[in-house]
UniProtKB/Swiss-Prot annotation:
Top EC category: hydrolase
Database matches in HAMAP family: Cas1
The protein, known as: CRISPR-associated endonuclease Cas1
Coiled coil ranges: none
Taxonomic source organism: Thermotoga maritima (strain ATCC 43589 / DSM 3109 / JCM 10099 / NBRC 100826 / MSB8)
Main function: CRISPR (clustered regularly interspaced short palindromic repeat), is an adaptive immune system that provides protection against mobile genetic elements (viruses, transposable elements and conjugative plasmids). CRISPR clusters contain sequences complementary to antecedent mobile elements and target invading nucleic acids. CRISPR clusters are transcribed and processed into CRISPR RNA (crRNA). Acts as a dsDNA endonuclease. Involved in the integration of spacer DNA into the CRISPR cassette.
Subunit-structure text: Homodimer. Forms a heterotetramer with a Cas2 homodimer.
PANTHER family named among the record's database cross-references: CRISPR-ASSOCIATED ENDONUCLEASE CAS1
Length: 319
């Protein structure tokens, strides 16, 4: 199952058992059988009947604004939610020791994934290894988040050494709005990854509102932000380098906005095409002794967390 991306403006309707997008240029029909979720970037109209159809077919729909920022999600009625597991999620959040175990594991493994990403590209990452040790010694989540933020800034400076075109270097991480080409690409990629993880959470018994590294507060969802941290190097950062160093993306794919930049529709379309390809790419899983897609790896992490919460397996350990 894959994501459907809509950049055109128009009206979304149900036609028989398909999704129909009506635009000035005509109608586009999308069979629902293989749709995991819908990501809307254009200006679309829809009605309650269409949302009922998506709910019946268990398809989340994510909305992004013109600049590519995530706005919100229509999250269908949770058909797999388990009251028992929700209680376990809450218990592991409220109990500081249990929460720290999960949060520390996420940070530690995300650091290791950054190190592996750099080592594959012949970049020394000794300082990140030191941050990993600091994370293991952190006493609370706030301290852990501070360590993670400092490490990621250093990590991005190392990525800059791999960028062939200096105009596309990160220099300093900026957001809302991103100030340069690199930050625009990374922010857009992260937004896509967050919604991908959110849609995959919907296919589990987990509640996306209860996270462990990111605070569970008035933010609608936080668990997807936690799990996405593990996959940013392999998905978003790798894609960023590939698009820039192969010169697939250039200045023509960006528009200036107030105090920053955004990807235009051509740039977004190019990015999501390569993003979906990255999610389909496979890696060899030693334990399973077979190749699995990146999307499948994300879902496997969610199942590991489920098992941890009910006491079947320690999160991060090999099955």
């Amino acid at each position: 199952m894959e994501s459907v991306y809509l950049f055109s403006s128009g009206t979304l309707k149900r036609k028989a058992n398909t999704i129909c997008l009506e635009t000035e240029s005509g109608r586009k029909y999308i069979p629902v059988e293989n749709v995991m979720d819908i990501k809307v970037f254009g200006e679309v109209d829809l009605n309650k009947r269409f949302l009922e159809f998506l709910s019946q077919k268990r398809i989340p729909i994510h909305f992004f604004n013109r600049e590519g920022y995530y706005v919100g999600t229509f999250y269908p009625r949770e058909y797999l939610n388990s009251g028992f597991l929700i209680l376990k999620q809450a218990e592991h959040y409220i109990n500081q020791e249990k929460r720290m175990l999960i949060a520390r594991e996420i940070v530690s493994r995300s650091f290791q994934n950054m190190v592996d990403f750099l080592k594959k590209r012949k970049v020394r990452a000794d300082s990140l290894t030191r941050y990993k040790k600091k994370a293991e010694e952190a006493s609370n989540v706030s301290e852990l988040m501070g360590i993670e933020g400092n490490a990621r800034e250093e990590y991005y400076s190392m990525i800059d050494s791999l960028v062939s075109d200096e105009r596309f270097r990160i220099e300093k991480r900026t957001r809302r709005p991103p100030k340069n080409f690199a930050n625009t690409l990374i922010s857009f990629g992260n937004s896509l990854l967050y919604t991908t993880v959110l849609s995959l959470i919907y296919q589990t018994h987990l509640d996306p509102r209860i996270g462990y590294l990111h605070e569970t507060n008035f933010r609608r969802f936080s668990l997807n932000l936690d799990i996405a941290e593990l996959f940013k190097p392999a998905v978003v950062d790798r894609l960023f380098l590939n698009l820039v160093n192969t010169r697939q993306i250039n200045e023509k794919h960006f528009d200036e906005i107030s105090e920053g930049l955004m990807l235009n529709d051509e740039g977004k379309s190019l990015f999501v095409k390569n993003y979906e390809q990255a999610l389909r790419e496979t890696v060899f899983h030693k334990k399973l002794n077979r190749y699995v897609s990146m999307r499948s790896l994300i879902k496997m992490e969610l199942h590991k967390l489920e098992k941890h919460l009910i006491g079947e397996q320690v999160f991060g350990s090999e099955e």
